[in-house]
Amino acid sequence: MVCRNVSRQQFRAIMIITSLLDTDLYKFSMMQVVLHHFPAAQVEYRYKCRTPGVNLRPYLDEIRAEVHELCQLRFTSEELDYLRGLRFIKSDFVDFLGLFHLPERCIFIGEGEQPGEISITVKGPWLHTILFEIPVLAIVNEVYFRNTRRNPDWEEGRKRLQSKMNLVLDDPALADFRVAEYGTRRRFSKVWHEEIVSTMKARMGVHFAGTSNVLLAMRHGVLPLGTMGHEYLQACQALGPRLRDSQVFALEVWAKEYRGDLGIALSDVYGMDAFLRDFDMYFCKLFDGARHDSGDPFVWGERLLEHYRANRADPRAKTLVFSDSLTFPRAIELARQFAGRCKVSFGIGTNLTNDLGHEPLQIVMKMVRCNGQPVAKVSDAPEKTMCDDPAYLAYLRQVFQLPPA
């Protein structure tokens, strides 16, 4: 996979990812569940660029070189000590991470089917491949932008960031507003990412809830944030007792692992209707709240609050987390809509870490198979549905009583 005409010294000189902590917290929270409950699971992930007309092929060798160096990384003693200090991380998991590295044999990078496309597939044990997604996407982004935007307008980026922060800082009615940075995978560069976090910490005070990036949380002394991602619920389609019960199974295993900690449930793997059918009184009272990641956030929030009331759970004690393509103005609208009715929190990604005046890439890497079986996400936004088996997708829709695509 490595480009043979570039020396190892040159590889190290251009490394984008220099720490295995340079990823999102929810990867570690899910990975711990995998270690304890599904250590033998085999999975496949596939990369997709949703932005039309992007030509990444000229940069294939650079991407391969960066991924090669990623696979040489190990956790340092300082990093392991930091993880050990997180209340929900168990000692045997940290011991495992002390032996961990990303297996280069499990990632395949080549040309895609369409002009300019590249293909990235990860295939292997879930426990050993789960940490590929975030750094690989960050690599693709940074390689692309350092070649196509050689002179970034940093001052424009800083101006945009300050104007966003001012929307909150200048409004006394937003005293309880909390926002987190969620932008690792689509960041313009790691240097810009770090500036965003350090600036928000310095200027936003209590309004800055933290970051999903574990390395930056450690460096800057802010809270690392995250619970579960789509891949966890998708994998449970293949790991649970039967497909119809897979969402309940996933939530029950999560509760068994964390015993009430990390209590934000993800709602959109099967759409909101299916989520509410499964999120019964037990889960309403057990979990701290839920995360919105597709569909109309205002409708979603109102439905969830009504569902809590119907299940005798006080919405004012619950947290609604919004993270779907958020901007500061939209987050502020949502904060006003639900003020005094529940707790709200916001995770803003691309609009923070890749807003320097050009179009960011819309790239994803999603799980498509687990234990040889197709898996799928059928969200409240049709364009986010990703599955390589139409027959399975149709069956999934039937089982969860979802409308046809």
UniProtKB/Swiss-Prot annotation:
One of its GO terms (cellular component) is cytosol. The keyword Ligase applies. Transiently phosphorylated on a His residue during the reaction cycle. Phosphorylation strongly increases the affinity for substrates and increases the rate of nicotinate D-ribonucleotide production. Dephosphorylation regenerates the low-affinity form of the enzyme, leading to product release. It holds the Pfam family NAPRTase_N. One of its GO terms (biological process) is NAD biosynthetic process via the salvage pathway. One of its GO terms (molecular function) is nicotinate phosphoribosyltransferase activity. It catalyses: nicotinate + 5-phospho-alpha-D-ribose 1-diphosphate + ATP + H2O = nicotinate beta-D-ribonucleotide + ADP + phosphate + diphosphate. Pathway: Cofactor biosynthesis; NAD(+) biosynthesis; nicotinate D-ribonucleotide from nicotinate: step 1/1. The keyword Electron transport does not apply. Transmembrane segments: none annotated. The modification Phosphohistidine is found at residue 230. InterPro entries: N/Namide_PRibTrfase, NAPRTase_N, Nic_PRibTrfase, Nic_PRibTrfase-Fam, Nicotinate_pribotase-like_C. Keywords: Ligase, Phosphoprotein, Pyridine nucleotide biosynthesis. Its EC number is 6.3.4.21. Catalyzes the synthesis of beta-nicotinate D-ribonucleotide from nicotinate and 5-phospho-D-ribose 1-phosphate at the expense of ATP. Belongs to the NAPRTase family. This is Nicotinate phosphoribosyltransferase. It comes from Bordetella parapertussis (strain 12822 / ATCC BAA-587 / NCTC 13253). The lineage of its organism: Bacteria, Pseudomonadati, Pseudomonadota, Betaproteobacteria, Burkholderiales. The gene is pncB.
